[in-house]
UniProtKB/Swiss-Prot annotation:
ATP binds at residue 267. This is Cysteine--tRNA ligase. Its EC number is 6.1.1.16. Keywords: Aminoacyl-tRNA synthetase, ATP-binding, Cytoplasm, Ligase, Metal-binding, Nucleotide-binding, Protein biosynthesis, Zinc. One of its GO terms (molecular function) is cysteine-tRNA ligase activity. It comes from Clostridium novyi (strain NT). HAMAP family: Cys_tRNA_synth. Binds 1 zinc ion per subunit. Belongs to the class-I aminoacyl-tRNA synthetase family. A motif ('KMSKS' region) lies at residues 264-268.
C-alpha cells in the first residue's frame, strides 16, 4: 500500500511502526460553531482512509481531537454570555450529530484540550528547560531558530518564511517567526495556574500534547486539511521533535480544499454551507459518493448540480442492488453451475482492481469507477437463469466494495421506492393543475435517475432501466 507523504512530497510504501496496527491522529474541529461541509470533506476523507485500513485487516487507533479553548471560542462565549465550557459542550454534541449524519465512524478517542492541561503545562516546561522556549511576562514562545529543521514540512526555510511573513511586530519575541505556546491571563478568559503565572495554552501545543499522550513519541500518520500544513502542523513538528528528540509522525497526509466558485470554502470568506444544511437536502451516502468522486488531494468544486449527479449515481447503484434482491426470489437454481465458475472469477477480478486502486494512495475516484464497471457487468450478465449462489455473491461483492467508502450499506430499497412514489404523486398533482413544465421536469429528473414512467389507463407505473 502506498500513500502520499506531504513531508517527502512523494508516494511511499506504508510501513507501520507495529505490524498490523495503525496509529492515526487527525486534527479535529474548534467547537465554537457547526462545522461547514469543507471541514466535512476532511473528516469524511480520513474516515474513509481509516475504514480502508480496517478493510485490509489493520487495527486502527484513530484519534481526533476537539479544540475547546481558543480565541474564537472565548469571543463567541462572551457574546452569548456563557462559559467556554458550556459552548464547547454544546458544539461537541452538535459535531457528533453531524458526523454521525455523514456516516463517519466514531474515533477511538476524541480528546478535549482542556482535559490535558497538566500534561500541556509539563510539555511547555520541558521545552523551556531544553532551551527551545522562553518566557516573557507570563507568555511563553517557541524559539524557531533553535529548531534547525523548522519549515521542513511546508518546504520553506526560516529565512524565506521571515521574508514573506505577515506577522505583527511583537517586541517581546526574539524572532518574528516565534510563536506562542502559552498565553498569559487576560480579563474575561479562562486560565490555569502554571509555574510562570496563570494563562492558557496556544493552539499548536494542544495537538502536540494530546497526540503524544495518546499515541506516543512517534505516530504512523498525522493528518488534516491542507490549510493546516503551515503553520499548525509545522509548529507541531517543531514542538514535538524538540521535546522528544524523535520523529513526530512517519507520514503526513493532507486533504485538498472543497471550493465554491473555485475559491476555498471558509467561514472567514463567508462562502460556506454547514454540514447540517447539506444533510437536510441530501442523504449521507450521496454526499460521500460526491466527496469521494475526486481524489482526496484534488480540490473539489461544490455545487448542487454535482450533488444531484451523485444522487442519480447512487440510485443507479441501488437499482442494481434492488434488481439482485428481487432475483433472489425468482431464480430456480441454488448452487453455482460449472458454466458460472468462470464468471465468478471475472467478478473476483473487480475486487482485485478495487484494491489496486485504493492501495495507490486511496484513489477513491478510480475505486468508484470499478464499482460502476462491476455493476454494469452484473446488470448485463445476471438474470433469472443465474444461480442463487451467484446472485448472492454479486450482491455481497457490491456491498463489500462500498463499505470502506461508507456507501451501499442500506438494507432495503423501501426508502428509495417511497421517494419515487412521492415524486410521482407530485407529478400527478402538477398534471391536474395543468403545470406541464413541473410535470415534465419531474419526469425528466426521474429518467435521469434511471426511473422510467409509463402513463396507463390504470394510472402511472414506473420501472427501473436495466
Amino acid at each position: 500500500m502506498k500513500l502520499f507523504n506531504t513531508m517527502t512530497r512523494q508516494k511511499e510504501e506504508f510501513k507501520p511502526i507495529k505490524d498490523g496496527e495503525v496509529s492515526m491522529y487527525v486534527c479535529g474541529p474548534t467547537v465554537y460553531n457547526y462545522f461547514h461541509i469543507g471541514n466535512g470533506r476532511t473528516f469524511l476523507v480520513f474516515d474513509t482512509i481509516r475504514r480502508y485500513f480496517e478493510y485490509r485487516g489493520y487495527k486502527v487507533n484513530f484519534i481526533q481531537n476537539f479544540t475547546d479553548i481558543d480565541d474564537k471560542m472565548i469571543k463567541k462565549a462572551n457574546e452569548e454570555n456563557i462559559t467556554v465550557k458550556e459552548l464547547g459542550d454544546r458544539f461537541i454534541h452538535e459535531y457528533y450529530k453531524d458526523a454521525d449524519g455523514l456516516n463517519i465512524k466514531r474515533a477511538t478517542a476524541n480528546p478535549r484540550a482542556t482535559e490535558y492541561m497538566d500534561e500541556i503545562i509539563q510539555f511547555v516546561k520541558d521545552l523551556i528547560d531544553k532551551g527551545y522556549a522562553y518566557e516573557v511576562n507570563g507568555d511563553v514562545y517557541f524559539s524557531t531558530k533553535q529548531f534547525k529543521e523548522y519549515g521542513k514540512l511546508s518546504g520553506q526555510n526560516l529565512d524565506d518564511l521571515q521574508a514573506g511573513a505577515r506577522i505583527s511586530v511583537d517586541e517581546r519575541k526574539k524572532d518574528p517567526m516565534d510563536f506562542a505556546i502559552w498565553k498569559s491571563e487576560k480579563p474575561g478568559e479562562p486560565s490555569w495556574n502554571c509555574p510562570w503565572g496563570k494563562g492558557r495554552p496556544g493552539w499548536h501545543i494542544e495537538c502536540s500534547c494530546m497526540a503524544h499522550k495518546l499515541l506516543g513519541d512517534t505516530i504512523d500518520i498525522h493528518a488534516g486539511g491542507a490549510d493546516l500544513v503551515f503553520p499548525h502542523h509545522e509548529n507541531e513538528i517543531a514542538q514535538s521533535e524538540a521535546r522528544n528528540g524523535k520523529t513526530f509522525a512517519n507520514y503526513w497526509m493532507h486533504s485538498a480544499y472543497l471550493n465554491i466558485n473555485n475559491k476555498k470554502m471558509s467561514k472567514s470568506l463567508n462562502n460556506f454551507f454547514t454540514t447540517r444544511e447539506i444533510l437536510e437536502k441530501y442523504d449521507a451516502e450521496v454526499i460521500r459518493l460526491f466527496m469521494l468522486s475526486a481524489h482526496y488531494r484534488t480540490p473539489l468544486n461544490f455545487s448542487d448540480d454535482l450533488l444531484q449527479s451523485a444522487k442519480a449515481s447512487n440510485e443507479r447503484l441501488y437499482n442494481a442492488i434492488g434488481n439482485l434482491e428481487r432475483l433472489l426470489d425468482e431464480v430456480k437454481v441454488d448452487k453455482v453451475t460449472e458454466n458460472e465458475k468462470e464468471y465468478v472469477k471475472n467478478l473476483e477480478s473487480y475486487k482485485e482492481k478495487y484494491i489496486e486502486k485504493m492501495d495507490d494512495d486511496f484513489n477513491t475516484a478510480d475505486a468508484i469507477s470499478v464499482i460502476f464497471d462491476l455493476v454494469k457487468d452484473i446488470n448485463t450478465n445476471i438474470n433469472t437463469e443465474s444461480s442463487k449462489e451467484l446472485v448472492e455473491y454479486s450482491l455481497e461483492l457490491i456491498r463489500e466494495l462500498g463499505k470502506p467508502l461508507g456507501i451501499l450499506q442500506k438494507s432495503t430499497m423501501l426508502d428509495l421506492n417511497a421517494e419515487i412514489e412521492k415524486l410521482i404523486e407530485q407529478r400527478q398533482q402538477a398534471r391536474k393543475d395543468k403545470d406541464w413544465a413541473l410535470a415534465d421536469k419531474i419526469r425528466d429528473d426521474l429518467k435521469a435517475r434511471g426511473i422510467v414512467l409509463e402513463d396507463t389507463p390504470q394510472g402511472v407505473r414506473w420501472k427501473r432501466e436495466q
